[in-house]
Amino acid sequence: MQANHHALCPQKNAACRITLAIIRVMCYSIGEEINLHKKSVTLGCMIMKTNQKTVEKKERGISKYIPAFAMFAVFETVAVSLWLSLDNLFYLLNFSYIGTCIAIGLALFAGGWKHARRFVQFAVGSYMLVYLGIISNENMQLEGFWYYLFTGVFEAATIHYAVAKIFGPLIFGRGWCGYACWTAMILDLLPYKQPQKPRKKGLGFIRYIMFALSFGLVAALFLCHAGNLERIMFWLFLGGNALYYVIGIVLAFAFKDNRAFCKYICPITVFLKPMSYFALFRIHCDESKCVGCGKCLKVCPMNVECNKESRERVNGTECILCFECKKACPVKAIK
């Protein structure tokens, strides 16, 4: 019996070893399948996340061009409405051109071109100064507005002021100052793009004096029954612009601030500021992201406290939508 028992042991041991080997192989195979499944799941999740990020990126890519499309739509609406109501093709071409230039500029800025605003300034500003003002003999300054208003003619300067400087700011704030003003177009070429000192307090009253003088000058011409008012308006346009450029350049170097004229002297802001307080398009700051570095305050040409989400006087009526603060923000808190 013992002999038989010893004879069977090697056979049992061999069978056990084979069984264990088979079990190991099966376990290894199952483990590999499990690992493969895990890898497949992980890869699938990664692909889903990548696709999701791609979709989000595309959505962000499209959304950043919304302001450009919106401004184009606004100006095209104005262009078509004036064309149909006044039966004058000029208004269709005029406002379509301005709206197209602004839309292209905003799209270029969204695409990362740093000179986009300057493109719009020269495309629109030079068109209004040279073509409308000098070639077409239209006084687009404040005196021209008073002149057409006194004569009861709703065209040219009166329409320009209604769209760009009285009702338009309800939509785009003081965007006129940042993108279309032919005075600022030249002043922005000067070396003091970033104000060297805080805004001067107590000088804002000068704009109201300039506003009153402009009104009084045109009123006096009508009361005195001056002859050839159209010719006088043309020379007032040329002389007024020359005077503005001289004052603006002198103030820029005196205060080391390119936009000193805009802050203290420009009479147009009397129209722009009240409506700009309610502007639809405006700079927003996510204060939860803001790190308080102050870079936005340093680069703002208008000394706007753009790191505060408010509609206070400075924030609500001084911003020209130049987006210098947005470009300077290191944490993308401004949009």
Segments and roles (model prediction):
Residues 2, 11-12, 17, 32-33, ...:
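Charged/polar low-complexity intrinsically disordered segments
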Residues 5-6, 37, 225, 284:
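Histidine (H) residue identity feature
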Residues 3-4, 13, 60, 260:
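Residue-level detector of alpha-helical transmembrane segments in integral membrane proteins
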Residues 309-322:
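Short linker/helix segments within small regulatory modules
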Residues 12-15, 27, 64:
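Intrinsically disordered, low-complexity N-terminal regions enriched in serine/proline/glycine
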Residues 1, 6-9, 282, 311:
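Secretory-pathway extracellular proteins and peptide precursors enriched for disulfide-bonded cysteines
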Residues 7, 17, 22, 26-29, ...:
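Short, positively charged and aromatic/hydrophobic N-terminal segments
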Residues 47-307, 317, 327, 331-335:
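Non-ligating segments of multi-cofactor redox enzymes
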